[in-house]
From Swiss-Prot:
Keyword Cell membrane appears in the UniProt entry: yes
Name of the protein: Potassium-transporting ATPase ATP-binding subunit
Membrane association type: Multi-pass membrane protein
Chain residues that bind ATP: D350, E354, F383, S384, A385, Q386, T387, R388, M389, S390, K401
Superkingdom of origin organism: Bacteria
Active site feature: D313 (4-aspartylphosphate intermediate)
Stored NCBIfam families: ATPase_P-type, kdpB
Class in the EC hierarchy, top level: translocase
Assembly: The system is composed of three essential subunits: KdpA, KdpB and KdpC.
Any one Gene Ontology molecular-function term assigned to this protein's record: magnesium ion binding
Length: 688
């Protein structure tokens, strides 16, 4: 990747983050986080108490209150810093995207043809539906679809990948993005957006969105944290009259002070996760962008972590995607050359890799030269997901090629007969994992073109990982059932959908969702748009059509369908990070009980000294040590919140057990050690 990656505490990010953390001390900024708002109120209260004490005669009590007050403000500041660092990384990424926007001159065409009259205009004046000519060395002014031409395009400014890509009319690689550069040849591009609606504009808006919407899980966790805060607030408030009653009843001791009560409240409420919760969500989206995936919202990232069904396109995801014509298998009474000639004619205007490979194979095997489709007076019939075949009409000749079922229906509709020998050829090709493409002329079946595809190395192991995580994998392919079954068995997927149409994909997604499952899928074509819109996590390819990108809730800048698996990992990592830090935060309270409660009541109930398990030097030292630890642990956990916990592909039960051991037990043990070390330091320095 050529895009700059920032370290956690990069000075470029740290300086503005520190200033932003100070600005976030404004109560209006704290209002969105109820837990930290309570801490802010406690800070203000203690600041007033501290001022009153210094104005009075209780100087020793005032010094103690000053120490507690200062560290409570630091607690708030550190929580703000975590969020500011996460937001700073997103803003830096947005700034890098803004740097890609260039003011360029576009060559606007009067018509969608290379030879049409052109005039130079500012790119900002272009509108949806306009056509432009972009030649070698020029920057593509706007997002659009390639209407004519084939060119090598440098997309490193967008994707970070230095290797150029081919963009061409027809097929799934016709979309181009404004800000990228044409390296060779030329392209006629039809603009698909208006000013302010370009891919870069939308990405910048998503990345630096001023107000990030909370995700459902985040809202649920926030409600839990608020409930816990209210419970602890009520419990602490009751300690004041209880303390007064105890002093009067026992005849000795001192009532608990406001400073101690506030310190106890802040240490008991879930400030750790409360301070880091927003940062975890922002960092999740930032990690997606680091993986070259733009998420439209944190909701999409979170949904990726809950996914339990993955719909994966066979071509490009499970297989290498470069299916090539390998053999011509003629029907009885048809020569191989006749089949090759017809297949070549049907493929002359076919811009897909498969279509071009048929033309090349016919030329290699029989020296059949390409024809000019216009000179032949031919009419090309394009492929569609509904008909699942393409071809050409030349005078009274009607040549078609396509899937077995589509050609069987086509031949039958022309009162033709589908030979059993061809059925056998189809089965033989499919059983070996190849794709049979049937060719016909009129009502006569000419034979089969065998296409070969290769399963990607290591993909079977990745599917095994997903299975251990409880995720079901489903391969989506337009191939017949025999071919699909052979490739599915080789790749190790759990299920497959053969002869897939847009309607079939949409129905399958709805079926899984009706069972209460969350579904993820990738897509790049306009025909994928309905299914992408229905899926819970929909990753559209950057090289795909505008309709696909608008229907999805994520865009993969690398246009790599396999990235869906990485998206799921990042989503699960975000959920695990949130759960782990919540467990750690709640487990922290145990040590703070043993530090603060005995210290608060020891003058009234000396017997509580037995609960001083850490042998803290004095009540004031115990309370201040707990407050300092409560603040420092937020700083200590910022790297974990921003990077995410280490995720391993395991079952939910295994992950829960590991989570409870490391973050539950760790959350109990670490505060005992930390508070004791801070107490020793304070005593050694003579500050208590």
């Amino acid at each position: 990747m050529s895009r700059k990656q920032f370290t956690l505490f990069d000075p470029v990010l740290l300086k503005p983050a520190l200033w932003s953390a100070v600005l976030k001390l404004d109560p209006r900024a704290q209002w969105h986080n109820p837990v930290m708002m309570v801490v802010w109120c406690c800070c203000v209260l203690l600041t007033i108490v501290c001022g009153v004490q210094f104005a009075g005669d209780s100087s020793s009590e005032a010094v103690f209150s000053l120490g507690v007050t200062a560290w409570l403000w630091f607690t708030l500041l550190f929580a703000n810093l975590a969020e500011a660092l996460a937001e700073g990384r997103s803003k830096a990424q947005a700034a890098s995207l803004k740097g890609l926007k260039k003011t360029v001159v576009a060559h606007k065409l009067a018509a969608a043809e290379h030879d049409a009259v052109s005039q130079p205009v500012p790119a900002d004046s272009l509108r949806k539906g306009d056509y432009v000519l972009v030649s070698a060395g020029e920057v593509i002014p706007y997002d659009g679809e390639v209407i004519e031409g084939v060119a090598s395009v440098d997309e490193s400014a967008i994707t970070g990948e230095s290797a150029p890509v081919i963009r061409e009319s027809g097929g799934d690689f016709s979309a181009v993005t404004g800000g990228t550069r044409v390296l060779s040849d030329w392209l006629v591009i039809g603009c698909t957006v208006n000013p302010g609606e370009t891919f870069l504009d939308r990405m910048i808006s998503m990345v630096e969105g001023a107000k990030r919407r909370k995700t459902p899980n985040e809202i649920a966790l926030s409600i839990l944290l608020v409930a816990l805060t209210l419970v602890f607030l009520l419990a602490v408030v009751t300690l004041m009259p209880f303390s007064q009653y105890s002093v009067n009843s026992m005849g000795h001791g001192e009532p608990i002070s406001v400073t101690v009560l506030v310190a106890l409240l802040v240490c008991l409420i879930p400030t750790t996760i409360g301070g880091l919760l927003s940062a975890i969500g922002v960092a999740g989206m930032s990690r997606m962008l680091a993986a070259n995936v733009i998420a439209t919202s944190g909701r999409a990232v979170e949904a990726a972590g809950d996914i339990d069904v993955l719909l994966l396109d066979k071509t490009g995801t499970i297989t290498l995607g470069n299916r090539q014509a390998a053999a011509f298998l003629p029907a009885p009474g048809i020569s191989e050359q006749e089949l090759a000639s017809a297949a070549q004619l049907a493929s002359l205007a076919d811009e897909t890799p498969e279509g071009r490979s048929i033309v090349v194979l016919a030329k290699q095997r029989f020296n059949l030269r390409e024809h000019d489709i216009h000179a032949l007076g031919a009419t090309f019939v394009p492929f569609s997901a509904q008909t699942r075949m393409s071809g050409v009409n030349i005078h009274d000749r009607m040549i078609r090629k396509g899937s077995v079922d589509a050609l069987r229906r086509h031949v039958a509709s022309n009162q033709g007969h589908f030979p059993p020998e061809v059925e056998k050829q189809v089965e033989d090709v499919a059983k070996t994992g190849g794709t049979p493409l049937v060719v016909s002329e009129g009502a006569c079946v000419l034979g089969v073109v065998a296409l070969k595809d290769i399963v990607k190395g290591g993909i079977k192991e990745r599917f095994a990982e997903l299975r251990r995580m409880g995720i079901k994998t489903v391969m989506i392919t337009g191939d017949n059932r025999l071919t699909a079954a052979a490739i599915a068995a080789e790749a190790g997927v759990d299920d497959f959908l053969a002869e897939a149409t847009p309607e079939a994909k949409l129905a399958l997604i709805r079926q899984y969702q009706a069972e209460g499952r969350l579904v993820a899928m990738t897509g790049d074509g306009t025909n994928d748009a309905p299914a992408l819109a229905q899926a819970d996590v929909a990753v559209a390819m950057n090289s795909g059509t505008q309709a696909a990108k608008e229907a999805g809730n994520m865009v993969d800048l690398d246009s790599n369908p396999t990235k869906l698996i990485e998206v799921v990992h990042i989503g699960k990592q975000m959920l695990m990070t949130r759960g782990s830090l919540t467990t750690f935060s709640l487990a922290n309270d145990l040590a703070k009980y043993f530090a603060i409660l005995p210290a608060a009541f020891i003058t009234t109930y000396p017997q509580l000294g037995a609960l001083n398990l850490m042998h803290l030097s004095s009540p004031q030292s115990a309370i201040l040590s707990a407050v300092i630890f409560n603040a420092l642990i937020i700083i200590g956990l910022i790297p974990l919140a921003l990077r995410g916990v280490h995720y391993q592909p395991r079952s939910a039960k295994s992950l829960l057990r590991r989570n409870l051991f490391f973050y539950g037990l760790g959350g109990v043990v670490l505060p005992f050690i930390g508070i004791k070390v801070i107490d020793l330091f304070l005593t050694l320095m003579g500050w208590i």
